[in-house]
């Protein structure tokens, strides 16, 4: 019996198919708020399969191993010129392999049988996020590495390099700015429509369990950098593009995907003001930011 579970994130439906007998209760818990049972067509389906050895499904031609910290991202070239992917906790070898057939919307992520209990959640999470960015790019949809809070019905997105203090700044708003809640703490999604940009909660929120199926109009995007003072400035369009673009997940080796992302970022920055906040991790930083972004 097929163990298929369907979800909608930012209006895009996808499925996750587990091996028969494998429980979704713990493995797919972050996805529960996004679960659906309807007839809408799925963009893609991910199937989890277990093998004795990953070498039986992995290409021997490794093109790249990317990222400065886990999860490490592997790119393999197949004999037919297509790509497959891997994810791992270390740079020694991939812990799972993702195959994305060009002629089908069903992909497969493989884990070893002896590592399935430990690695299944890791494999599914990383594979689904990658597939989501692939398949939603043509629909003005961007997954962003950011922390987002909702305040009085609007979303405020904080960008920055790892360790800059995105989550810390969100917590400062939660602690000091009334009527504020956390929407997502690691991988929110922006979707652009004709006259507005919306930001959505997702099942992917990093170390913070914040899986909210809600969306709000995106009111501001703020890139953070650490400083011994608190100062904020609005960015010009070119600066805004350069600020948002690197934070977006994308298949950067694919010209078509990159073209879609460029257009989506351009649309976003024409609708949403972008800022640079040089700041300390203190209450004043939240208030300086609040006063600037709500003045628009």
What function would you assign to each model-found segment?
Residues 1-157, 162, 172-181, 189-296:
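A noncatalytic interaction/capping subdomain that flanks phosphate/NTP-handling catalytic cores
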Residues 169:
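Hydrophobic positions on the alpha1 helix immediately C-terminal to the Walker A/P-loop
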Residues 165:
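Conserved glycine(s) of the Walker
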């Amino acid at each position: 019996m097929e163990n298929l579970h369907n979800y909608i994130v930012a209006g895009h439906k996808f499925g996750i198919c587990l091996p028969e007998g494998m429980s979704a209760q713990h493995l797919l818990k972050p996805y529960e708020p996004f679960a659906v049972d309807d007839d809408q067509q799925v963009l893609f389906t991910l199937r989890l399969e277990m093998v004795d050895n990953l070498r039986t499904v992995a290409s021997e031609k490794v093109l790249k191993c990317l990222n400065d910290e886990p999860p490490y991202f592997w790119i393999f070239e197949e004999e037919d010129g297509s790509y497959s992917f891997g994810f791992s906790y270390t740079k020694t070898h991939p812990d799972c392999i993702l195959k994305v057939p060009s002629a089908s919307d069903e992909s497969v992520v493989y884990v070893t049988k002896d590592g399935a209990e430990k690695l299944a959640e890791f494999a599914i999470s990383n594979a689904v996020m990658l597939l989501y960015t692939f398949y939603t790019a043509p629909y003005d949809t961007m997954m962003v590495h950011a922390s987002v809070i909702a305040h009085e019905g609007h979303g405020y997105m904080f960008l920055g390099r790892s360790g800059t203090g995105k989550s810390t700044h969100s917590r400062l708003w939660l602690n000091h700015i009334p009527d504020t809640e956390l929407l997502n703490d690691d991988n929110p999604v922006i979707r652009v429509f004709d006259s507005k940009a919306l930001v959505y909660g997702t099942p992917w929120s990093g170390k913070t369990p914040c899986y909210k199926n809600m969306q709000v109009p995106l009111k501001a995007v703020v890139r953070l950098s650490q400083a011994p003072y608190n100062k904020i400035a609005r960015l010009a369009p070119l600066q805004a593009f350069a600020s948002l673009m690197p934070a977006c997940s994308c298949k950067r080796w694919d010209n078509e995907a990159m073209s879609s992302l460029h257009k989506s970022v351009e649309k976003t920055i024409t609708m949403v003001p972008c800022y640079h906040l040089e700041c300390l991790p203190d209450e004043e930083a939240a208030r300086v930011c609040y006063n600037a972004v709500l003045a628009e």
